Amino acid sequence: MFIKFYFFIIFLILNFKNNYASPTLLDSVLSSTSSLSSPGSFFIETEFCPPPLLYRYSSDLEGDKGRGYKYVEFPNGTMSHCVHPCPSLYFSDGDWTTMMDMSLIVATISFFASIFLILTYSPLMNPSYNNRHTIGILSMSFGIFLIMFTDMYNLKKRFTLGCPSETRYAIQNDADCLITGLIFQFGCVSAVFFWTALSLDLYFQITNRNISRKYDLYYFIGVNLISLIFTFVPVISKSYGYGDFALGCWILDFNYALGCFWIPLSVCLIFSTVVVLMILYEVYKIYKASNQKTSLKGHIKPLLCLISNCFEFFYVFGYSLYLATKLTELHDNMDAYIKCLFLNSQNDPDSYTCPDHRLKLGPQFLFFLSLRLLGVSGIVFYGTNSKVRKIWKNSILINNRFIGKYFSFNSGTSTPVGSKNRSKTSSQLYDNSFGDSGILEEIREYDEKVKNGIIVTPGGDDDNINNNNNNNNNNNNNNNNNNNNNNNNNNNNNNNNNNNNNNNNNNNNNSNENNENNTQEIELTNINTIDNV
């Protein structure tokens, strides 16, 4: 009898716990209306926080929130001593690691690519650095370098820069966060502005519109000054920090991010898109007049690289706009997920099915990748053409005694016929300040050859150009010989007569030389006579 009564009491206790205990603990808190005037002053007094939430007691809630701690807050203002982990729960730990690894790998490549471009177009390597287009490439490369530098700074720190501890997000008061945030913002803004300026300059070059050089300094100073303003304005409201969707510190306040980056970026994208379409139209007109379909191949690469940068910026802008419009929904899903964690912690595990609160890895991965491909796109567009090779071959780093002792960059022992003329033409084109993507040089060569009645495919290999030059020079020499033979032999085209004419020409030359020598002797005699007098 006693044993039956004992089991009956246990059954009542278990039934009461399963049916009444958990709703009373949480639901009464969530549905309660606190009599306190300030929301968030009512806490769930428990030291237990369901994973992955972390427990941290706070006696100064508002102060700790300003220091980067994100306490769990329910819709009715109820607070707990549980905080969100850093990095955020919008991605799994594996997803965060994947994105960080990709970022560091691609950023490292872009970092050294930007250094290569900076060296190539700097006064150290490039004697014709003081023109608008070269300054634009150099400045854009420096902006990309700054963007990638913030990732390189994370090689050892990884998540510790944005997450000083597993419970705290970095804010502007953290020196590393502020410095990297400023560098990243200035690099992004200046790179976008100079990229826009380069697209406009490319259009001016193709259409042969000359802009006064006095504006070069004005535009360089103006772009950097505007970039500095957009960089330091958010500092006023302490808007720099580490967010829920980032790998590094940037502007947290949406209004400041909108005014100091997204609106300028959208304006630059619209403007650059129009300019790119105008460039494509100009190139189309040139090739339509040439009646050669294959000639378009010489310009596909530079134009695709220019357009790819535009797509990269468009994706960054579009995805960020998508996150901004979905932010309220994402926060609601996170609140529902956290509520589900508390409910399951008070009941049997998995008693409640928690809603999906995470973002998909693919779009966010592509967002980070697009930013870090800027350096790769830059070196493809501006670092892989004949002009860059010429700059490096003539630079002090390559063209010196030490390198020349062990390496030779000459393709052969003999100098091709007409090489001087070709070098002179290339130098003149290079001094015209474009020569960076190769497109303008090819267009000008094409126009010149159309005027002369010679149409060839532009953008060919250097060897083909040399062979064509040699063939043209040989043809010119043969024509000259034929003309001489024709003049001396009354247009007789037989090979034997040509040889005889050559011999006659040689004899005539020898006779002329003898006459010149006799003349020189007579002159010397006259001079001596005068001296004697």
From Swiss-Prot:
Transmembrane segments: 104-124, 135-155, 178-198, 217-237, 260-280, 303-323, 361-381
Glycosylated residue positions: N76
Chain ranges on the Extracellular side, renumbered to this chain: 22-103, 156-177, 238-259, 324-360
Leader sequence residues: 1-21
GO terms under cellular component: membrane
Location(s) in or outside the cell: Membrane
Membrane topology qualifier: Multi-pass membrane protein
Main location: membrane
Keyword Transmembrane helix included in the entry's annotation: yes
Keywords: Coiled coil, Glycoprotein, Membrane, Receptor, Signal, Transmembrane, Transmembrane helix
Protein name: Frizzled/smoothened-like sans CRD protein H
Origin species: Dictyostelium discoideum
Start-end of Polar residues biased regions: 519-533
Cytoplasmic domain ranges by topology: 125-134, 199-216, 281-302, 382-533
Family statement drawn from the similarity comment of this UniProt entry: Belongs to the G-protein coupled receptor Fz/Smo family.
Span list, region Disordered: 454-533
